[in-house]
Amino acid sequence: HGGVINGIYQTPGKRSPNWDKGVLFEGMFNRWVVNRIIEKLDRKKIPYYHISPEFTDTTLETRTNRANHIFDQNPDVWILSIHANAGGGTGIEGFTTLGQKTSDGIGDLVLRNLKDDMIGTSMRFDWSDGDRDKEKDYYILKRPMAPAFLIECGFMDHPIDYNNLWDEIYIDTLVDSLVRSIIEVYNI
């Protein structure tokens, strides 16, 4: 999702209600998390690829094409897609595509670490197929050649999650957990 350019949010919808901290734009939140992950990976000298660095709303097709080009050159990569949710729920949830794939193991590791690290945060697990993730054929999960995992870091339209998504400690803990998972996936 897009960021804020000259005070204008680049993606229709994808925002919280205008509560006490103001409107939380999903694209803005996503960038907070991704940029902190990038900083930590840089400091640890861990290589990564960023398939959506623009502040404009980059299409799913463009992001997928970029990911597929990277995968052609480096088939060891996987996709971590960061989001903030909406729809009246609460908590963290993660998604992989339908069926048992490499992404299920990655997603289960990420969600296990988040459960351990995000003390007191509701986790929305789906154990119906033996792992924690939910399965949906979202474009960014189904179309790339690389394994892909999508994480929803909380619900922008739930008061507790809204406050968490603005909270520095919550974001730092989330980022530390995601970086730990990246390191574990790559066995670094």
Language-model features: locations:
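Active-site-proximal helix/loop segments of hydrolytic enzymes
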Residues: 24-188
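Short glycine-rich His-centered loop
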Residues: 1-23
